[in-house]
């Protein structure tokens, strides 16, 4: 997700595979701008060099950031438990990340079956928001 809601909810280490709307960069010189700069711009946001300022998000046919992929894979590979939720597991490469999990506890929360055959210790067939909102920590 590109909206930063995981961070607002308190998540400390988020691998934003598809980027973030809170970071924006010039397509010409690479200079970064924050979301406020884009909001205050009239029309298409422009850099001081004249280039177009684009949200740092992955659009169709654009590649994912290799460093972000590496971080996500390493985190999954070293995890003891993995919770998968709210995904069809259809879109790659993210759907394939589960193959790196070597831990002993796997849980899936999803309102429908996933496209990938997963041998989970726990499967809950319901919307993830409904289930997670019931958890008291």
Where are these regions (language model features)?
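Conserved catalytic alpha/beta core of Sir2/sirtuin-type deacylases, generalized to analogous enzyme cores
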Residues: 2-137
């Amino acid at each position: 997700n590109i909206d930063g809601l995981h961070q607002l909810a308190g998540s400390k280490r988020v691998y934003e595979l598809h980027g973030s709307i809170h970071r924006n960069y010039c397509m010409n010189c690479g200079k970064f701008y924050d979301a406020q700069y884009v909001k205050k711009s009239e029309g298409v946001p422009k850099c001081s060099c004249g280039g177009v300022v684009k949200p740092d998000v992955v659009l169709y046919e654009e590649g994912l950031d290799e460093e972000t992929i590496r971080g996500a894979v390493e985190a999954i590979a070293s995890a003891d438990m993995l919770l998968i939720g709210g995904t069809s597991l259809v879109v790659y490469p993210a759907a394939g990340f589960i193959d790196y999990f070597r831990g002993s506890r796997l849980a899936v929360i999803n309102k429908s079956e996933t496209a990938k055959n997963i041998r989970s210790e726990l499967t809950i067939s319901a919307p993830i928001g409904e289930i997670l909102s019931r958890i008291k920590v």
